[in-house]
Amino acid sequence: MIMCGITAIFNIHDGAQALRKQALLMSKRIRHRGPDWSGIYQGKTAILAHERLSIVDPASGGQPLVSPDGKLILCVNGEIYNHQELRERLKGDYEFQTGSDCEVILALYKKKGIDFIEDLNGIFAFALYDEEKGVYLIARDPIGVIPLYIGYDDEGHLMVSSELKGLEGFATHYEPFLPGHYFYSEDRKLTRWYTRDWMDYANVKDNPTDVQQLHDALEAAVKRQLMSDVPYGVLLSGGLDSSITSAIAKKYAAKRIETNGKADAWWPQLHSFAIGLKDAPDLLAARKVADAIGTVHHEIHYTIQEGLDALRDVIYHIETYDVTTVRASTPMLSLIHI
């Protein structure tokens, strides 16, 4: 998934201006993640940068986001699915500056301090800088849908980046920022914020199967992820997973979920996309599913040689040699270039 990109440098005690060039270079390395906007904020002890791919509020949702009093600065890569509910709850406590779904993070922090992450329903990696207090908070979503890496240099600077390449040459030590964790500068350590009973199989192994509950939960999950101010489509392989999620998306695509189905969507029909070798069985299956659910279907072919030629770029972007991930990502890179 390509979304926005964030980079940040914290623990700056010898003048942020000296590190501005580094911060810009870190952000430039991940600019492919955000073609719509590049932004940077330089504070007393931190620099935050953002590369934006617009999904919600394209006109005014540029980042870094800044609170009305100018004391809180935020960079986010992600989507907050329950932002409308949170806005309604917080509107008396915070003056929202944009329509961005991510601005609710600033409002929550202002009201609750760091004890708000459980309030978020979404996928995210964010860095929040409280300039007045001189502290910062970094967090990642429960299962790590959104990528984030953390690194340190020999001068004690802490850095984060959506991709490893943003830290290369600057950090002497770096590692993945753990899913479901946050880092608060006052604590100086990673802390798990997301924990559930079902993480221990012993707690759920005897639970009865409830097919209707599974159906309702899956449909609700797909529906809330259709929140968008720009056109969207579905990737359809013809397999069970993509067929089910595409069918659910098609069910709700005609109306804007942001209005609880009261307003028509801005695009008349859901488009589906499938890519593969010519005459591949998956393409045939995807075509059948598209016909059955009624999407405008696009079938793209690529050759084995084109796949081999793309390998270097694929590995550069996904930053892993894992065979399964490389195999799945190769046709996806060809698809997004069309």
Predicted regions and their residues:
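Adenylate-forming
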Residues: 327-333
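Acceptor-substrate binding/catalytic loop of class I
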Residues: 324
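Cysteine-centered catalytic environments shared across enzyme families
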Residues: 2-321
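Conserved small/polar residues in nucleotide/adenosyl-binding loops
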Residues: 336-338
